[in-house]
Design a protein with these regions (language model features):
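Membrane-anchoring hydrophobic helices of lipid-metabolizing enzymes
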Residues: 1-126, 160-164, 168-170, 309-319
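Non-catalytic C-terminal accessory region of glycerolipid acyltransferases
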Residues: 2-9, 47, 72-79, 114-117, ...
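A generic secondary-structure micro-motif detector
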Residues: 11, 45, 102, 125, ...
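Short Gly/charged-rich anion-binding patches and loops
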Residues: 20, 54, 110, 134, ...
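A conditional alpha-helix N-cap/helix-loop micro-motif detector
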Residues: 102-106, 155, 175-178, 215-216, ...
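Catalytic core of membrane glycerolipid acyltransferases/transacylases, capturing the structured
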Residues: 117-177, 203-207, 214
């Protein structure tokens, strides 16, 4: 049993190490933390050569008309962005319902909150745009029930840390694949929000939908759940602004009952693409988004004409 004991020890060690770093980072003013994060990201740009090459290749597929200089400039900014995200995640517990508006602008969120107050349940389709943990944390501070799905991590200590962090803003976390997850998901949707991050090519049932003009395998499970439960859907993304604050953005809510899960998945992916085009340096281009996984491909992509528009942001009223 040495193996399980060692894994348990390592998991706890990771949790306490990350928690200690977070406690230290929480004491640093946000602008100072972002400055250190940019420096860390610049270092990563120079050191992580494999990730840099992959990111440059992927952004070249998405923006073939860009010059090499523009691609390199954007990917360098991407590394800096993710360096800042690390410090911001550590800093998140400083946000409260009283202080959130100082650092966060809400775009279109009030429409969804009013529908929740009227008894509607939602599936929130989200992506790794901007600081996605900032998005879930600040939506959690709005006072309506939010539950997010989380795939099991190899390092359980890190997963435990993220779950604890989200809980500070009232966000619940469900581990994907747990025996109780189907029941918990249905419960979460009733009068609340169930969130999925679904912009990556992972080992789960997926469909090919257009992403920057190329078919990309995208998880279909979130759309299936929305259709089967009769939930409404909304695309949720985050965007960092030049002044260091963030926008937590919900696009226009839409009905999922009776819809086609493939078309909904394509619609959501189009919404992600529109946000990425707004701030291309705030998405992880080192991810192999167009990787082929034939064993997980469950259907053919829809035609372009069948994909409804993603919608847009809207009111900036604080929810």
């Amino acid at each position: 049993m040495a193996g399980p004991r060692l894994r348990a020890f390592r998991s706890r060690a990771i949790y306490h190490f990350v928690a200690a770093l977070t406690a230290a980072g929480r004491r640093i003013p946000l602008p100072a933390g972002q400055f250190f994060g940019r420096a860390l990201g610049t270092l990563a740009w120079h050191v992580l050569r494999r990730e840099r090459r992959r990111a440059l290749a992927n952004i070249g597929m998405a923006f073939p008309d860009w010059s090499d200089a523009q691609r390199r400039r954007t990917i360098r900014a991407m590394f800096r962005h993710f360096g800042m995200c690390l410090f911001e995640i550590a800093w998140l517990p400083n946000l409260t319902p009283e202080t959130r508006d100082r650092y966060t602008k809400y775009d279109g969120v009030d429409r969804t909150m009013k529908l929740i107050d009227a008894g509607r349940g939602f599936v929130v389709f989200s992506a790794h745009c901007g600081n996605w943990e900032w998005l879930s944390y600040t939506i959690g501070l709005c006072g309506r029930p939010l539950t997010v799905m989380q795939r099991e991590r190899d390092e359980h200590g890190l997963g435990e840390f993220i779950t604890t962090l989200r809980g500070k803003s009232g966000v619940r976390t469900i581990d994907r694949g747990s025996a109780s997850s189907p029941r918990e998901m249905i419960k979460a949707i009733r009068g609340g929000m169930l969130g999925f991050v679904m912009d990556q090519n992972i080992r789960t049932e997926s469909v090919k939908v257009p992403f920057f003009g190329r078919p990309a395998l995208t998880p279909i499970g979130p759309a299936r759940i929305a259709v089967r439960t009769g939930a409404m859907g909304v695309i949720g993304v985050c965007e960092r602004l030049p002044d260091g604050t963030h926008v937590s953005r919900f696009l226009e809510p839409f009905e999922c009952a009776g819809g086609d899960p493939v078309e909904i998945t394509a619609r959501v992916t189009r919404g992600f693409e529109e946000q990425i085009r707004r701030a291309p340096e705030q998405w992880p281009w080192f991810h192999d988004r167009w990787r082929e996984r034939p064993q997980w491909d469950v259907t053919e992509p829809p035609t372009a004409a069948a994909i409804p528009p993603a919608g847009s942001g809207g009111s900036t009223q604080t929810p």
